[in-house]
Amino acid sequence: VVVENGIAAIMDVAGFNYRPHLYQYAYDKLPQQIILGSETASTVSSRGVYKFPVTRQSMKKYDDHQSSSYDVEHCGWSNLPEDDWLWHNDKSWAIGEFVWTGFDYLGEPTPYYTDWPSHSSLFGIVDLAGLPKDRFYLYRSHWNKDVETLHILPHWNWEGREGEVTPVFVYTNYPSAELFINGKSQGKRTKDMSVTVENSADSTSMANFKRQQRY
């Protein structure tokens, strides 16, 4: 609306909340030709809680009122961190973001709005106790190249999942990582720089975590 009515055109910088899918449209329309993510992500997660199967979910609810720390769940209006980063990396006019949010806080327990006794948000990169969630290391690996980041999840010893395949995620600012279990290589992954904001926007790419493969 603010693009069409001219309000965004008179601002020094046009900011968009949870609208990366409108960035190109706004860039083509606005005279400033710079776009800021003034509120982004709202990925939800609970520190140390991992849900299976690992699938991208919107407004997913569980009986324990938690969200998966695999960092693949978000709100109906929001997205995952990589959805924003692709714009910043691929388009020089997408100048950055303010992530919602740094710390969990009391209130807005999305997606458990009406589910007693939920009362804490799940948006935070850091939890209510000030302890980093897995997502903290994802952001650090992307934002802070001066600090070595090599973070693996979930827990290494998963009682009750014997004989099952447990997905392993690694957040690192190294170009590649290799996973070893009991001294045996399980394979090596290299960041896929061929993934772009344009070739990863379809539903199949989203479901297959194509965007995550770049980071």
Predicted regions and their residues:
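Extended substrate-binding grooves/exosites of carbohydrate-active enzymes
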Residues: V1-M193, V197-R214
